[in-house]
């Protein structure tokens, strides 16, 4: 199951999650948290509409009653109320694998947009996660570090987030760190591993973070170890970026079919 928002272009959010699940051979269900559209007449600004909390709770109840879930991925929540609704449901469900993509802002938004959800996410969702996949900005927020400039900083951030949450961490450096490679750091309390792939450009690609967390979720559901899941997810996303889709949007979108195309 993914608990995430719908992004109208299909490049990120719940649609990216479901496409990733299908590409990796698992069945996905969806509890929708919000609907994100853009304003093409105003620099593609975000238009976010939350799903009513009772409607969200009804979706979560339906899915948890219908299936014995192997893994749950949590994506865009968007508000303290939504975080509370989802956290309450996850406490009751207690999934074996709960993968948290700690989305604080949508791509293109300013960091200040995260302030009203930051503390709620840390207090209510992070303690429930078994695996967390923060990007550069989210790693700063969750670790309490003032800056992450290189791989050593990213390692420290991953260790801090694990120490505070107990979750396995895959901290994403992506294109934010200098150098020829897109570097992520895996840490589970004992194993520290740097996952690296050559960069494809220097600009973030929409859907990469969503697809990475969804790929981890899919692989865990299939029985992979956390490290195996992280390695496969890294390869999946790297292939999707190599086969990314251009459009009239101010950013490209990852294509989930890239992994199979390169197989």
Stretch-by-stretch model annotation:
Residues 50, 227-263:
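Charged C-terminal helix
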Residues 84, 88-92, 167, 191, ...:
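Nucleotide and nucleotide-moiety/phosphate-recognizing core
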Residues 140-141, 202-226:
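Short, small-residue alpha-helix embedded
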């Amino acid at each position: 199951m993914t608990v995430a928002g719908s992004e109208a272009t299909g490049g990120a959010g719940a649609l990216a999650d479901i496409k990733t699940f299908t590409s990796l051979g698992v069945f996905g269900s969806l509890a929708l948290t919000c609907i994100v559209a853009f304003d093409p007449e105003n620099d593609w600004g975000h238009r976010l509409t939350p799903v009513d909390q009772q409607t969200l709770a009804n979706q979560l109840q339906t899915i948890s009653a219908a299936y014995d879930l192997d893994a749950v991925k949590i994506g865009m929540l968007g508000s303290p109320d939504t975080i509370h609704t989802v956290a309450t449901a996850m406490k009751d469900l207690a999934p074996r694998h709960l993968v948290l993509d700690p989305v604080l802002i949508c791509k293109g938004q300013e960091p200040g947009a995260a302030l009203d959800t930051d503390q709620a996410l840390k207090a209510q969702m992070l303690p429930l996660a078994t695996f967390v996949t923060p990007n550069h900005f989210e790693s700063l927020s969750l670790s309490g570090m003032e800056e992450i400039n290189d791989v050593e900083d990213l390692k420290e951030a991953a260790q801090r987030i694990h120490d505070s949450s107990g979750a396995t961490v895959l901290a994403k450096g992506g294109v934010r760190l200098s150098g020829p490679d897109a570097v992520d750091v895996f840490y589970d309390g004992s194993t520290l591993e740097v996952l690296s792939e050559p960069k494809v450009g220097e600009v973030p690609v929409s859907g990469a973070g969503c697809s990475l967390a969804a790929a981890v979720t899919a692989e865990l559901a299939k029985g992979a170890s956390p490290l195996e899941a992280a390695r496969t997810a890294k390869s999946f996303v790297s292939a999707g970026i190599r086969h990314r889709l251009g459009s009239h949007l101010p950013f490209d979108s990852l294509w989930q079919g890239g992994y199979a195309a390169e197989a």
